[in-house]
């Protein structure tokens, strides 16, 4: 059994990748956590979740989601979140966690100020459920699946491919939020 470890302010104590490649791709099972849930925590990284099988009750700040097989979630930077087993059933999922600088490159770049901060600094946009019946949501789910495939057998240009996919996902999120 595992559990998330946090500081007193609930910030997760875990490295999500490293400075050179700030991405963590992690297959998970909710049943592997003590008592079938992971503790409330936050981190500066953005988190994309894809439900491989089963269901999970997922909380982000004050929002509750029921995530089912084939669905997913965008969890913004610095959002408090937790996940719980649903009706005692296991849930397998993939978590792709990455630092925002992986998208924008360097501090105060146009990519940061125009495209990344626009989303990460808006407290109203703490999360977004990727639904099965929304085409652009399913495009993102397929891209998360592509990242999963790449991680299983990393090709020579693995990091570059992951970067391009995450930038494409970010573009879709940006176009959604800029139209709000």
Question: Predicted segment positions?
Answer:
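Short histidine-centered beta-strand/loop micro-motifs
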Residues: 35-42, 84-86, 106-108, 158
């Amino acid at each position: 059994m595992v559990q998330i470890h946090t500081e007193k302010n609930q910030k997760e104590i875990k490295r999500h990748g490293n400075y050179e490649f700030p991405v963590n791709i992690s297959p998970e099972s909710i049943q592997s956590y003590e008592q079938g849930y992971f503790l409330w925590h936050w981190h500066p990284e953005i988190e994309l979740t894809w439900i491989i099988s089963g269901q999970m009750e997922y909380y982000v700040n004050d929002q509750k989601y029921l995530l089912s097989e084939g669905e997913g979630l965008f969890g913004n930077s610095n959002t408090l979140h937790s996940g719980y087993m649903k009706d005692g059933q296991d849930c397998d999922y993939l978590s792709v966690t990455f630092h925002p600088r992986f998208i924008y490159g360097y501090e105060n770049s146009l990519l940061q100020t125009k495209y990344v901060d626009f989303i990460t600094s808006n407290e109203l946009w703490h999360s977004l459920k990727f639904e099965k019946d929304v085409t652009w949501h399913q495009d993102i789910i397929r891209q998360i699946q592509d990242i999963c495939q790449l991680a299983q057998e990393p090709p020579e240009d693995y990091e570059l491919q992951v970067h391009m996919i995450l930038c494409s996902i970010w573009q879709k999120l940006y176009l959604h939020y800029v139209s709000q």
